[in-house]
Amino acid sequence: MSFLEEHYGIRRNLILDRLEFMPYTPSADAGKGYRPMRGKDYNTMFVDLQMAGVSCYQNFLRAVIDSNYAKEFNPYTDYLYALPPWDGTDYIAQLADTLTTENRELWQKGFKRWIVGLVACALSDEDMNQLVIILYSEQGKGKSSWIRRLLPPEWKEYFYNGIIDPSNKDDARLLATRIIINMEEFEGVKPGELAALKRIIAQDNVTQRKAYDIEAFTLPRHCSFIASTNNRQCLQDIGGNRRFLPITITGIDYH
């Protein structure tokens, strides 16, 4: 145990439900930060132990690492709680104003509600963000780039771009392992598909079973949905539903 503590940082990512490690000793991989544990990484640790004269079985090493020995890590709380105290500036309004829209008041109120819901959903296992913003403009305005920039670099891995299929197990898992799902090139939904989309937006957890686990486990939903489209018609198709906020963009300021 002392050898591992001296040479490696080992943690369990609570959002991605995976083990991650970082070597402390000088090597080609040192300084790259934490990364997922792969089979070769277990093997490397085992070889390091043997070369250091520490005798143990390889399955015991795996058991130690994949246990409560690994400290818990939440990327959302780790980042947010390290930020400086709020200075009173309305940064949400400033961020919202980087988009010029046809109805500024509606956009300001809607975006504040959505971004506050995003943070609450990320931090809490109980809160859900059931509002979906749909950004419309002509092609080439940079909607997807603007959406990506909503997240800090530390959360890059927790962004998903694309339409999800709730019947697909891997897609359903994204509800728990991503903070933003951007339904890029959203073309609206057929009348029969709207109910299914609303169920996804309101879903509060994902229940699955890994191949090597004994029982199924439940992961809380942490994602918020946003969509971008070049099709004005889809705004009319989805309009009138309280879960969706269609916004027409006339300009984007990246500065």
Question: Which residues fall in each region the model found?
Answer:
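P-loop NTPase catalytic core of nucleic-acid-dependent motor ATPases
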Residues: 67-176
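AAA+/SF3 P-loop NTPase mechanochemical coupling elements
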Residues: 170-176, 210-228
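Short glycine-/polar-rich loops that comprise or flank the Walker A/P-loop
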Residues: 177-179, 204, 221-224, 239-245
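Conserved catalytic/switch belt of AAA+ P-loop NTPases
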Residues: 194-217
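Short, polar loop motifs at secondary-structure junctions
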Residues: 230-233
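A short helix-turn-beta junction within AAA+ P-loop NTPase domains corresponding to the substrate/partner-engaging
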Residues: 235-254
